[in-house]
A protein has these predicted regions:
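Hydrophobic faces of well-ordered beta-strands that scaffold small-molecule active sites
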Residues: 79-84, 135-137, 168-170, 191-193, ...
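Conserved short loop/turn motifs at secondary-structure junctions
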Residues: 84-87, 142, 170-172, 234-236, ...
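N-terminal [4Fe-4S]-dependent radical SAM core
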Residues: 41-119, 123-125, 129-134, 365
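Auxiliary Fe-S-binding modules of radical SAM enzymes
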Residues: 2-59, 63-76, 251-371
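Generic, ordered loop/turn and secondary-structure boundary motif
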Residues: 60, 80-82, 86-88, 93, ...
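Conserved Radical SAM active-site core
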Residues: 103-252
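Alpha-helix N-cap/helix-start motif
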Residues: 74, 92, 146-147, 243, ...
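Mobile, glycine- and charge-enriched loop segments
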Residues: 77-85, 93, 97-103, 155-162, ...
């Protein structure tokens, strides 16, 4: 859950994300990009080498092809506006090195009880009034074991949000098949459970929950019929190869996630990564390159700029939209971190000729090759 809280703020380190490929690698990536741009449907048989070749394409070529794919599979003027509310803050037993809500670190975040349904309804109404069409609810705990009363309360929250005409999403840690059935019966639209980073780098960030634990939860969500929302965090100290590995995990699932949030680490004082990464900001080209590659290898998926977007210049955000990003988080806060406000984002969309995506009405094209 805390995976949604992420992003950087300080001096920018020299970019490690890009390099100039050898001519043979360029030829291979050009052929792969051309084939991907002409694809009629998503594929789940990507190799890690293929994704690496796409990721390492010269950046402007990469954006050109990702924009082409985006326009073939989506209405490029539509951007989904999502709002995230913390319904249970702090006190999490996990040791995620980036998270303000871990009980293992002194971050100033106090453990709180789950909020009342009425508070959620009020926040959802405000989000809808400001143009948001997906309302997300996050709880800071490891899993849903022994939380039957909380699950009933959250199911009621989901029902109330749905009745407003909003899409509903929750992020509650690990869930089993029976818990997912209850959420599905309540009408849940999507469940967020991030993989965070590559399988190889993951143990450097989290030790209390395995990578396979995360994949099992995602499988439980997928099997329930609820849409999968799963993404990661950039700026944890990983390498470009870990960006490739993170995308490889998502792009080779039995079916692609319905949405992929891309977070930019927000270093939190008191966390291990707050100290390590405070002076090192993941370069923007790495964020853009990851988003563009995600669009190409998961063409029908919603690609969402999540935590840390407030650190990006307006023109950088516009480049992300051009590259295939078609969702953002907006509102007062993202769990415990800053968030771009509704008024600011309405003006952003107006200025760049974009419009909010309607609830339950996402435009997914049946692509035809455009010459």
């Amino acid at each position: 859950m805390a995976s949604m809280a992420a992003a950087s703020a300080s001096k920018t380190a020299p970019s490690k994300a890009t390099h100039v490929p050898f001519p043979s690698a360029l030829n291979k990536s050009n052929k792969l990009l051309a084939e991907s741009a002409a694809a009629a449907a998503p594929r789940t048989t990507w190799t890690r080498e293929e994704i690496a070749n796409i990721y390492n394409t010269p950046l402007l070529d990469l954006i050109y092809h990702s924009s082409t794919v985006h326009r073939r599979f989506h209405d490029p003027s539509e951007v989904q506006l999502c709002t995230l509310l913390s319904i249970k803050t702090g006190g999490c037993s996990e040791d995620c090195k980036y998270c303000a809500q871990s009980s293992r670190y002194d971050t100033g975040t106090k453990a709180e009880k789950i909020v009342q349904v009425d508070e959620v309804i009020e926040a959802a109404r405000e989000a809808k009034a400001n143009g948001s069409t997906r309302f997300c609810m996050g709880a800071a705990w490891r899993d849903m074991k022994g939380r039957k009363s909380n699950l009933r309360k959250i199911s009621q929250m989901v029902k109330e949000v749905n009745e407003m005409g909003l899409e509903s999403c929750v992020t509650l840690g690990m869930v089993d098949a029976e818990q997912m059935k209850q959420l599905k019966d309540a009408g849940l639209t999507a469940y967020n459970h991030n993989v965070d980073t590559s399988r190889e780098f993951y143990p450097s960030v989290i030790t209390t929950r395995s990578y396979d634990d995360r994949l099992q939860t995602i499988e439980n969500v997928r099997d329930s019929g609820v849409k999968v929302c799963s993404g990661g965090i950039l700026g944890l100290g990983e390498t470009p190869d870990d960006h490739v590995g993170f995308l490889y995990t998502l792009a080779t699932m039995p079916s692609h996630p319905e949405s992929v949030p891309i977070n930019r680490l927000v270093p939190i004082k008191g966390t291990p990564l707050g100290a390590e990464q405070e002076k090192i900001q993941i370069p923007f080209d790495a964020v853009l390159r990851t988003a563009a590659t995600a669009r190409i290898v998961m063409p029908s998926t919603i690609i969402r700029l999540a935590a840390g977007r407030y650190t990006m210049k307006e023109t950088d955000q516009a480049m992300c939209f051009m590259a295939g990003v078609n969702a953002i988080f907006t509102g007062k806060k993202m769990l415990t971190t800053m968030c771009n406000g509704w008024d600011e984002d309405k003006e952003l969309l107006r200025k760049w000729g974009l419009k909010p995506m309607k609830s339950f009405e996402r435009t997914v094209k049946q692509p035809e090759l455009e010459l």
